Structure formats: C-alpha cells, structure tokens
Amino acid sequence: MAKPRRNNKNKKGQSRSQAREKEEAELLKLQERIDQYDPAVDEKSISQFSDLPITQETLRGLNESSFMSLTDIQKKTIPIALKGEDLMGTARTGSGKTLAFLIPVVESLIRNKITEHDGLAALIVSPTRELAVQTFEVLTKIGKYNTFSAGLVTGGKDVQYEKERVSRMNILVGTPGRISQHLNEAVGMETSNLQVLVLDEADRCLDMGFKKQIDNIVGHLPPTRQTLLFSATVSDSVKDLARLSLTNPKRIGVSSDQDVSATPESLDQYYIRIPLDEKLDVLWSFIKSHLKSKILVFFSSSKQVQYAYETFRTLQPGISLLKLYGRHKQTSRLETTVKFTQAQYACLFATDIVARGLDFPAIDWVVQVDCPEDAVTYVHRVGRAARFGRQGKSLLMLLPSEEEGMLKRLENNKIEPKFMNIKQKSKKSIRPQLQSLCFKDPMIKNLGQRAFISYYKSVYIQKDKDVFKVEELPSEKYAASLGLPGAPKIKIKGGSSSKEKKNASRQLVALSKTNEDGESVENEASKVRTKYDRMFERKNQNVLSEHYLKLNGSQTKEDEDEEEEDDFMSVKRKDHELTEVELPDLTIPVSKRQAKKALSKKLSISTKGNPTKLKFDDEGVAHAIYELEDEEDFIKRGDAKEQKKAFVSRETEVMNEADEEDKIMAKEKRQEKKRKRKEVEKRMRDEELQSGDDEETVYTLGGDVDLERDMEYSTDEEEQPQNKKPKWFENDKHNRKNPVNHIVEIDEPETLEDLESLTARLLQH
C-alpha cells in the first residue's frame, strides 16, 4: 500500500512543478510583449484591456468589474508603466487615472513574485480619505484573484490597530499624514523592498499642506523604485516634486508647459451674475425646480455647509439633503459618500474636499455657490459631472465684483461658460423663513454668524485680489439674507495658517505646553478671569502709587532692599541739580560745500575710501574684505558665460555632495531611532517573560495531557479550592426556619466546660 502513496506524492509534485513552469513561461511571454511595445506603432492597435500584456488573474478581475475598454490616458500610460519607467501623467478629471496606475502596480508585484513575507512592495498616496477609500475599493475589485495583502490607512482610525498589522501589507493605500506617521513609528515596517510609489492627485496633496509629509515619505523609500505621479493639473509645485522624486520620467497628457487640462466635452457650463444677498434664494429656487436630479453644491467653508444644510432641511425642499466636509468623523463621511453614491435623486452640500478624484455616478448638476479660488479648482469641481463621457451641467454663481476677473482666468485656460439669465418669477425669497428660524433656534443663529465670518475670512485670505475684493462685499445685506439681525464682528488673527495647525504633530503641541519637569502648564491668557479676580487684582485704590512713593523717598528699608534685588531699573535720586559739563567747541563749516558734505552721509563716506577690515581664509592668509579683481585679469580667465557655467557646476557638485551626506545622516538617525525603540520594546517583552517565569506557571494550549510535565511543576502545598457559594437549602437562614430538621451530634459531656459549650451551641441553633 505504500508504493501507490509515493506515486501519488510524486504525481502531485510533478503537477506543481509543471504549473510553476507554465506560469513562468507565461510571465516570460508577457515580458517579451512589454519589451517589444512601441508607443508610436502599437498604441492605435490597443482598445480593450484584453489587448494589454497583463496576467489572466488581473484581466479576470477587470472583466468582472465591467472594465472593458481603455480610455486615452490608460492607452498611453499603462504600457509605459508596465516597462518599469517613471511616469508623470496628466489628464482631465473623470478620464480613468485610477486604473492607469493600479494595473501597473498589481502587474509589477506579480512579475517580481512578491509574497506576504516580502513586506511593503507598493505605496499609493491619496490626498483625502474618501479618495483613498475609493482607490482601495477599486484595487480589491481588480486584484481579487491575486494573493497579495493590501491595507488602507487614513486619519480618524485606531493608530495602534494599524501599527500591529501594517508591517504585513504588500500594498498600502492611505493619506500622506498617516503613512508618514507609520513610517516614523511603526516597528517592523521595512521599505527596502518597495517596487512602486504612486502619488495620486499630487497637486492637491501639496495644496493641502502635505509637502513635509510627502518629503518624509520619499526620504524613507529606496532610490531604485518606480514612481508614478498622476494629477489633473500641473503646477510649479508639482514640477518641483516630479524633479525630486522621478528619474527621467515620461510626460504623458501634457503637450506644453502652458497647457492646462480643460473640462470634459460633454459638460454644459453656465454662469450667472448675482448679488451676494440673493445667493441662498437662488439656490433654494434652483433645488425646488430640479427635484428629479442629482445635485452637488460647493461652498467655500464648512460653516456655510452646516448652515445651509440645517436651514434647508428644516424648510424641506422635497429632495434628500446630505452634507460632507473635512471636520466630519470618518464613519459619518463614509456613510454620506455611500448614500449619495447609491441615491438616484439627492443634493449634497460639500466643500472642496469632494472636488478631487471622487467618482459619484450620474451627477446631473454641479452648482458652485461661491467662486473658486482659481481655474484649477474650477476644473476639479465641475469634473465631478460628465465623467467617462456622460452628460452633465454646471452652474457658477459670480458676484458683480468677481465676474470680470474670474472670466478672464477661465478664458486663459480655454474655458468659456455661457451666461444664463434668471427669471424673477421663478426666484423665491426665503429670507423671512430664515429670520424666523434664527429667532426661534439659537443654534441656527449661531451657525449663521459663523457662516458669515467664515465666508468673509475665505475671501480675505485669497491671493488673487483682482477677483476677490472683500471691501466691496455688502456685509449688512448679506447678514440680513442669512436671517441675522446685524453683521457680526470679524477678528482676523495673524500667525500660522490653519493648514499648518491641522497638520502639526499633536505630541509636539502637547510637549510645547509643558515645563522643564514635563508637567503640563495651563496658559495664563486662556484662563477665564471673573469679576472677583479683577476686584482682588486692583491696586492703588486708597494709597499712593509705588512710583510716587519712590520719587518722594518714603520707602522703608525693607522695600529698598527688595528693590535692589528685584528691580532692574529704578529711580535713584529725585529733584537733583544738574551740573553743567563743559562741551567741546564745534567748528561750524564756513562754505556751503563743506556744510553739505558734513550733513550728507554719502559724501562723507566717499572721501574715507574703502574699509580696511581684513578677512582670513582657511590657510590663515589675510585679505582685504573688498579685494576686487581687475577687468584685465578677469578677461584673461576666459569668457564670462563659461566662467559662470563652471562656477554653477562646481557649486552644484558641492551641494549634491552635501545633500547626499545630509540624506545619509538623516537615514542613520531614523534607523538609530527605530533601533532604540525596538530595544525598548524587546526589553519590555523580556521583563514580562521574566515575571512570568518567576511565578512558575505553565499554560497548555491544546494537545494531549502530559502528566510528567505537569508533575514537574506541581508543589506539595497546593492551593485550597475556593469555597463554593452555599445553595438555598444549605443557608443558615433556612436552617433557622426549620430547626427540627437540624441535628446536632455531640459527645457525652463529662465536665462543666463541656456542658457550657453544649449550651452555647444549642442556643445558636
């Protein structure tokens, strides 16, 4: 019977080796197709995902997710990314950039035979939590037949839970802040085997203030990686990031530096000219006239979103209302995203957090209540509609002061929205209802005041002052349109921006509020001072001031001693007579030229010549500080342009060497920090194990009973089992109620003491 079993094992081993050889042969064929690909010749012949040199597992996931045909950006980027080259892709919003980098990521891991033991192999950075969630969902759909482990890390989740599992991930999708935190703090998270880095919506990441986090992420990664950078627009900051992160990148989708991605062709764009105090009336009328539509409304601040949502929900326009902004909890943000995605007719009030990358299906209208900060933001906002060739419409509300400047900036980017007239009959005013709500509900009134202040601040901080003119805004009319009795007072504080405060490390903020001993110290300015505090702090109500007492010399000796110790400057004598000091005779210049020369600093310096200060070089040789070279000596050294190029090249080499040294030093510091953290954790684990060994306790997890092993750890003095709780029929109270059933057994008493003890026992029972 043993021989057939061996034959079966041999057959299984042969089948496994054959399957492995077949898989390697398929990968070699795919690699040959990738190497032979020529964009100029083969791009026209590719129209379906099945035409690409990708594995059957990835193709099966694409087909089941209904991804069949390729878009323009996918045709151009996927074959080049499969070759392993760095890529900088730019295309219109809604053109399929997500699949353009997810397919190369999955295929790169398959060709490199990455397993769960190889650690992190691909890193995808998204600017917002919603976009990261959407990217992760698409990744799980197309990669469901592969054996990679993928994880999603975003803000608003348990950091410790993520740290325990992030080291076992092959593909990691997340926001810049959380990924940077894990790279700095997570133990066991190695990036030496990383193959691909993807920066999705790179310009948005930089606009949101994540430059430091992205630089930190890039610094942790190996230089031999492949980097894919995708964005809907290209700015100077994105070009700088590409220059630092990419190596000889292929630029796809951008024909020139001045080219900016236009809006989709299937999008109908309109704008209206409207006063500030009529915006909410027009928005209400628009929603009432489009109840059978899916509408996305953009505001400039989260406070405006809250106010519009609460008031419109109370007035009940007849359509489902939703809100989405940055300071929501992560769970509620995901619920809102899912509800709006699945709804057929709904209206979502949102900030620019929704303007990038999110794919909401079948949006009919995009309404911009507040003017976007630039043409790039306009492109991303209206790009939520008319995605993947669908029809869509957009409406932009412009103030009379914003119309001319904003239209010029849109025309410069080849965007020409059509003007739309508003019929006065179709416009309905909701100002009386808003005033009634603010009068009845203090919460809505507070929201209105905060919305007013946040809108003015958003206009004030805009850089383009030709478009945004805060001095021309009618504050009283706008406050009345919100239902407020008057315009609130606005205090605009200077200092660091809100983005920097939001992205600042909470540990550093907490550390800044501690003293030298590490104890937290409350800020004196933030304390609330009551009228009693001010009453006890009053001074000089019935006595003369300290300064007057000092001048009159009516201080005591103790006060004078304290003054000498504590005061830095004090009055030492009073009403003293000044002694006349003989002043030197100043000769007045006779001529006007000498007088002018004496009064003019420039003329007086010209006669003194150059300064005679000496400067010593590294070898200790003294040189004059203004030691200049003659023109003849300069010409002998060669052409000025050639000297300039040589100087720039020398300094560039010096800076590159210094940069490499700084990177090596920073990397050593990070490794040393991580090593110390690992030592501390190892020491803590050893202490726990030692404490467990001292107690000499053995835990058996499964398996058969081992009596010899158990007897080795047994002791003579076993712990007595804990007394069980007496049952109801064993209770003393029950025994007292039934004294007949209780029998007391005793020996025959012989002495007087025995009789006394017997009497006591009988009395107890």
From Swiss-Prot:
Segments of skewed composition (Basic and acidic residues): 641-653, 678-688
Any one GO MF annotation of this record: identical protein binding
Keyword Calcium: no
Pfam families: CTE_SPB4, DEAD, Helicase_C
Motif residue range(s): Q motif: 47-75
UniProt-annotated stretches for the region Disordered: 1-24, 493-526, 552-576, 641-735
Swiss-Prot/TrEMBL keywords: ATP-binding, Helicase, Hydrolase, Nucleotide-binding, Nucleus, Ribosome biogenesis, RNA-binding, rRNA processing
GO biological process: rRNA processing
Described purpose of this protein according to its UniProt entry: ATP-dependent RNA helicase required for ribosome biogenesis. Involved in the release of U14 snoRNA in pre-ribosomal complexes. Required for pre-rRNA cleavage at site A2.
Protein name: ATP-dependent RNA helicase DBP4
Source species: Scheffersomyces stipitis (strain ATCC 58785 / CBS 6054 / NBRC 10063 / NRRL Y-11545) (Yeast)
Lineage of the organism: Eukaryota, Fungi, Dikarya, Ascomycota, Saccharomycotina
